[in-house]
Amino acid sequence: MLIQNNFPKDFMDLAQNIVTKKANIFRFVCSTGDKLVATNTNETLVQYGNYKEGFYSPKESAVLQKLYIENEFKDSYKKDDKEPFESCVLYQKNVFFYKINDSIRNKIKIAELYTSKDPAREFMQGVFFDKEGKIVATDGRIMYVTNGIPEFPVCQIKVTKILLKILDIADYIEMGIKYANSKNKETNQEVRVAKYIIFNFKIGTSEFTYSCKLIEGKFPNWKAVIPEKQDFHVVPFDKKIWKDIYSASKKLQPRYDKNLYFTIEDSNHVTISNDDIVYATIEWSIEPDINKRNVLVFNADYLNILLTKSGELIDIGYTNFLRAFTFTYKDGSIAVAMPTQIKE
C-alpha cells in the first residue's frame, strides 16, 4: 500500500543521485523517525528532523508499509546488529571540520574535470588533497594543480554527481575526515587511517550531512610530471574563436577522432585542421618547438577543458611539441597536458 507524503524537496532531489536502481533496500529513502537517510553504502545523505517512520521512494515521494520492507529485506542488510540505514550514518565525534569557501568549491569542481573516468583506474578517479595543501587531479594525460587548504589531511575524494550538486547549491559547506582503525598488512598492527569524507552543509535553514568513502591506493607522484622549465611561452589565442572551432569539430569529426592539428604558417598565423577539414587560420604568435617542429596536435576535448573550463588562462609554456605543456592561470593554478603523439 502506498501513502502519499510531502517530504523536503531538496533532500529528495539530492537523494535521487544516491539511491540504487537495483532491487534491494537501498533503492528507498528511509525515515528512522528522527532523520531521513539515503544511501548506497558507499555514500550517504542525511537530514535530521521529525518524519513518519517508513521507506520512501525519492521519485514518487511515497511511503511503503514498514513491516513489508522489514520482512523482505531488513535481516539481510543488518550490520553490527544495527538497522542497515543506521549503520551507514557516520557519527562525527572527533571529526574536525574546515569551512569550504567559494574559491575551494570552484577548484574542486574544476579538478573533477581532470579525473579519470576509466573504472580500471580507480586511483586516478578522485581529487587528491596533498600534504602541502595542494588540490590535484589527473587522468594520466592532463593534470590540474591548485592551492587548497594548507592544513587539510592527505586524502583522495571521489567527486560524485551529488557532491557536484551540493557544491553548486549549498549556502554553507564544511568538510572533515572520519578515521577508522585498520590492520596494516605488512606489520599486522592496528593503524588509524582516513576512511570517509564528511560534508555538513546548509540549503537555506535546512541542515544536511553527506559522506562518501575515500579512494584508497597511492595517488601518482604528480610533482614528477611538472616540467622544471619551458623554453617557450605564449599567450592563449582568442577564446571565442576556440569555442567556434571546437563546436564545429564536434559536429564534423567522427567520435573516435578528437585530434586537432595546429600548423604554424608564419610568425603570426596558425591553421587549425583535421585531415581534409580546415577550420580556420588564426592570428597567434607561437614559435616552432626546440626541434623546429611546426605542427602541434591536441585532443580537442582536453584542450577545451584547458582553455575554457579551468579559469583565466594567462600563459602556455612548452619546449617540445611531443612533450608536456604547462598552462598557467591567473589564480595561480596550473595544468599539465600531453599533446597527441604523431608520426614524423
What are these regions (language model features)?
Residues 1-344:
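Structural preference for solvent-exposed beta-strand-turn elements
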